[in-house]
């Protein structure tokens, strides 16, 4: 397998695992995952609002997840670890699921979108963007965006400091897609800089030279021009 095909295969497998965990752990407030390869296997960290539901009674559910990750999705020696989300309002995936759930329960899309924006910003986020796409009010599909604060849309910062969450709401008119982007508090923005004040500034150098003396010396060193009398 070429290196390009390997990258594509790893990306497809990660998306499949993400969809599987999102479906199985919806009641637990699934907030994303992280996969890291180690010398002894693969470390899979699951972030959830309710870790107890992920673990299950006597660890039954987490053992089932480990078996499925190994046999169905081909992850080598998976070691599943569950971590609780410190602040669910700052987790993009959890907020996307909450927004989709509110839309399914009949909330007006503007009220639901602004409510998510307000919760995220009140929790200290630097920026938040909510995108709702689908048949919102009529037969024609459209896209509605809600933005507040600082959001980066392109470049490396959009991948490193912006957290993204995706969810779908199933309604009678069709499926509504939901996307939530959050810039968490404490993120280092690309245009942010600090000016450090030196504790002891260096003293200014005083040059002991006389400009006029140097100029006179240069004139004295130059030969005098010879004038030829015209006949």
From Swiss-Prot:
Annotated InterPro entries: KH_dom, KH_dom-like_a/b, KH_dom_type_2, KH_sf_prok-type, Ribosomal_S3_C_sf, Ribosomal_uS3_arc, Ribosomal_uS3_C, Ribosomal_uS3_euk/arc
Domain KH type-2, residue spans: 17-86
Cysteine disulfide links: none
Coiled coil: none
CDD domains recorded: KH-II_30S_S3_arch (cd02411)
A biological process term (GO) from this entry: translation
SMART domains the UniProt entry points to: KH
Record keyword Ribosomal protein present: yes
Record's keyword terms, sorted: Ribonucleoprotein, Ribosomal protein, RNA-binding, rRNA-binding
Family, as annotated: Belongs to the universal ribosomal protein uS3 family.
Protein purpose: Binds the lower part of the 30S subunit head.
Subunit field text: Part of the 30S ribosomal subunit.
Protein name: Small ribosomal subunit protein uS3
Gene source species: Methanocorpusculum labreanum (strain ATCC 43576 / DSM 4855 / Z)
Lineage, top ranks: Archaea, Methanobacteriati, Methanobacteriota, Stenosarchaea group, Methanomicrobia
């Amino acid at each position: 397998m070429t290196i390009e095909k390997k990258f594509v295969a790893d990306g497809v497998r990660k998306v499949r695992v993400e969809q599987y965990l999102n479906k199985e752990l919806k009641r637990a407030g699934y907030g994303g995952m992280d996969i890291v390869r180690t010398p002894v296997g693969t470390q899979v960290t699951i972030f959830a609002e309710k870790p107890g539901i992920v673990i299950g009674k006597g660890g039954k559910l987490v053992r089932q997840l480990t078996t499925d990750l190994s046999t169905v999705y081909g992850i080598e020696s998976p070691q599943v670890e569950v971590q609780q989300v410190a602040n669910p309002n700052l987790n993009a995936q959890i907020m996307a699921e909450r927004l989709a759930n509110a839309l399914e329960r009949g909330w007006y899309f503007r009220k639901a979108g602004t409510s998510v924006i307000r919760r995220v910003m009140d929790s200290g986020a630097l920026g938040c963007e909510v995108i709702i796409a689908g048949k919102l009010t009529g037969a024609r599909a459209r896209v509605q965006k809600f933005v507040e604060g600082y959001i980066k849309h392109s470049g490396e910062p959009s991948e490193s400091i912006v957290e993204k969450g995706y969810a779908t709401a199933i309604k009678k008119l069709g499926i509504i897609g939901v996307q939530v982007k959050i810039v968490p508090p404490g993120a280092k923005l690309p245009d942010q800089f600090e000016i450090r004040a030196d504790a002891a500034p260096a003293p200014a150098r005083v040059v002991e030279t006389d400009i006029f003396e140097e100029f006179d010396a240069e004139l004295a060193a130059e030969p005098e021009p010879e004038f030829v009398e015209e006949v």
